[in-house]
Design a protein with these regions (language model features):
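N-terminus-centered regions that define maturation/targeting leaders and the start
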Residues: 1-209
Length: 209
């Protein structure tokens, strides 16, 4: 959709960004627990550029994700993917997955897609910023500079119930006070310029250390 936006408009909005401080994982007062989840992807390194097949310039599939051991006491996992560099008031939600069983250690390529009211194992793919279920492929304006796509994975214990197809607000309310551990992975994408770290990436990495 935004690939047709003239490059000069994207360049004009270069400094208009939601901000990394508005990511879910940076929510004021959100207790992230005492442990870290080791989140990674076999398709790209942390902080590296997305292969095009995961974006609006390619097949638009969700990338594969893997993570390490989940702390004892966690009874579910929840994932949200946000773009804090979107030219908007708030980060754009690219994916939301609720109720991942704690025994799982991966989401394969293309796994984040619409699932109606959810799966029989309790997981449910929620709404992205376009109000549709599934993976919203990265589609940054040409000339706007690199965008971070921040994968935030939470191990939860006793999280409250959410309705079918939860959105970001439902997600934040449900995880608050129930996080055992958290992990983060950043992929980048841009149009019309060389791949480079976005303005907020250094600060984001510092907060995750």
């Amino acid at each position: 959709m935004l690939e047709h936006l003239p490059r000069w408009i994207g360049a004009l909005m270069h400094n208009v960004r939601a901000g990394h401080s508005k990511l879910v994982i940076a929510e004021p007062g959100l207790d992230l627990g005492q442990m870290t989840l080791d989140l990674s992807s076999p398709a790209f390194a942390n902080g590296a550029r997305f292969p095009a097949r995961f974006t609006a310039d390619g097949e638009g599939l969700s990338p594969p994700l893997v993570w390490g051991d989940v702390p004892a006491g966690a009874d579910s996992l929840a994932l949200i993917v946000e773009d804090p560099d979107a030219p908007a008031l708030n980060p754009m939600v690219h994916a939301l997955v609720w109720g991942i069983p704690p025994s799982e250690r991966a989401l394969p390529e293309g796994a984040i897609r619409g699932d109606g009211a959810g799966s029989s194992d309790g997981r449910d793919v929620g709404r992205n910023s376009m109000l549709s279920e599934g993976w919203l492929p990265p589609d940054p304006p040409s000339g706007h500079g690199p965008h971070d796509y921040v994968f935030q994975l939470f191990a939860l214990s006793g999280a409250r119930e959410v309705g079918p197809n939860p959105g970001r607000l439902d997600f934040v309310r449900a995880i608050s006070g129930h996080i055992v551990a958290a992990g983060m992975l950043v992929g980048t994408y841009s149009r019309g310029e060389p791949a480079a770290a976005s303005p907020g990436q250094a600060a984001l990495r510092g907060n995750a250390a």
